[in-house]
From Swiss-Prot:
It comes from Burkholderia thailandensis (strain ATCC 700388 / DSM 13276 / CCUG 48851 / CIP 106301 / E264). The gene is rplF. One of its GO terms (biological process) is cytoplasmic translation. Part of the 50S ribosomal subunit. HAMAP family: Ribosomal_uL6_B. This is Large ribosomal subunit protein uL6. PROSITE patterns: RIBOSOMAL_L6_1. GO terms for cellular component: cytosolic large ribosomal subunit. The keyword Ribosomal protein applies.
Amino acid sequence: MSRVGKSPIALQGAEVKLADGSITVKGPLGTITQAVNPLVNVANNDGTLNLSPVDDSREANALSGTMRAIIANMVQGVTKGFERKLTLVGVGYRAQAQGDKLNLSLGFSHPVVHQMPEGIKAETPTQTEIVIKGIDKQKVGQVAAEVRGYRPPEPYKGKGVRYADEVVILKETKKK
């Protein structure tokens, strides 16, 4: 059995509903629904969730660990939430959050407007910082990657959009 799949999930203030083939996690920040793979059994035991593979196959074993990680992220998302911080490095690079849109000035001849998907919010504490928040870890990471993709850090000066914890290794310029 998967080492990850063995450990139980603590439901820290979240409600869980197990329907046929899906799991719904409800917490103070919102609700997330996810389909459960039929090769995985989910059991709710007094504030903890236990997952186990249906049989001893390698696939069921692997999927039990994967489903456990996904459900644990759902519980964390509806109780604490997820956030991803981005920084803009470069002269004139600016960001501004307006409702469900993120306006970016990234050195192009036109401003870049990124539409936020449902359930994801963007904040700009300063003009060169972006904080993307939401309850779905996958969506938060996807939106952060899309915003970074508009102008990834270039290897010579490091200009561009980068994750706050990202280390950009700079190349040396060509010498004669």
